[in-house]
Amino acid sequence: MKKLEQLYEGKAKKVYKTDVEDVLIVDYKDDATAFNGEKRGTIVGKGVINNRMSNYIMKQLEKEGVPTHYIEELSDRETAVKKVQIVPLEVIIRNVSAGSFAKKLGIEEGRKLLCPTLEFSYKDDSLGDPMINSSYAKALGLATQEEIDTISTYAYKVNEVMIKYFEGIGIELIDFKIEFGRYHDQIILADEISPDTCRLWDIKTHEKLDKDRFRRDLGNVEDAYLEVFKRLGIE
């Protein structure tokens, strides 16, 4: 497989065309952003950790029946993925009160929720990725009811699998954001799963091991990402 021209560069990744139909190459960067790009910086080694961690988790999810865009890890930073049409919805699952959820509802951070919550946000940085419901998504033509049902089912399954997996390495899955795409009329998990897209706390100390360390200027960002990577035991 040959890497061809760059198709897109986002906040955390570059995407390249290949000489294979319906296959792209994703190149993970060390760039870090927060608050819809208002805060910018660099987390040394983040690209390697996010690439390898995301691939590792997606392979586990495939075993549990969640289809993903993952094809093959090409290098520490590059992965071959299926070319999908991204559904313009960010899907957020929350298990514990944190971040904007806690602030918006006036709930203390760290409060265990009685059940996981599912949110949709409209993917548009210029609007601040506003929260919408399934009726909005259908009315705007972002997704059909069948697609929304499939996305919701997969999102809860991802949560179920990851909660157990992270608990096994002493990490609590607070919340996470995922994205889905259309691939030959099938809905599959796309984008990434990493400390950029998940809130991960040490179960015993509640130390934050995710991008909140960058957002909130807590320091030791690289160490936190590396700690998650090491606990996963990725070789």
Swiss-Prot record:
It holds the Pfam family SAICAR_synt. It catalyses: 5-amino-1-(5-phospho-D-ribosyl)imidazole-4-carboxylate + L-aspartate + ATP = (2S)-2-[5-amino-1-(5-phospho-beta-D-ribosyl)imidazole-4-carboxamido]succinate + ADP + phosphate + 2 H(+). Pathway: Purine metabolism; IMP biosynthesis via de novo pathway; 5-amino-1-(5-phospho-D-ribosyl)imidazole-4-carboxamide from 5-amino-1-(5-phospho-D-ribosyl)imidazole-4-carboxylate: step 1/2. The keyword Nucleotidyltransferase does not apply. Belongs to the SAICAR synthetase family. HAMAP family: SAICAR_synth. This is Phosphoribosylaminoimidazole-succinocarboxamide synthase. The gene is purC.
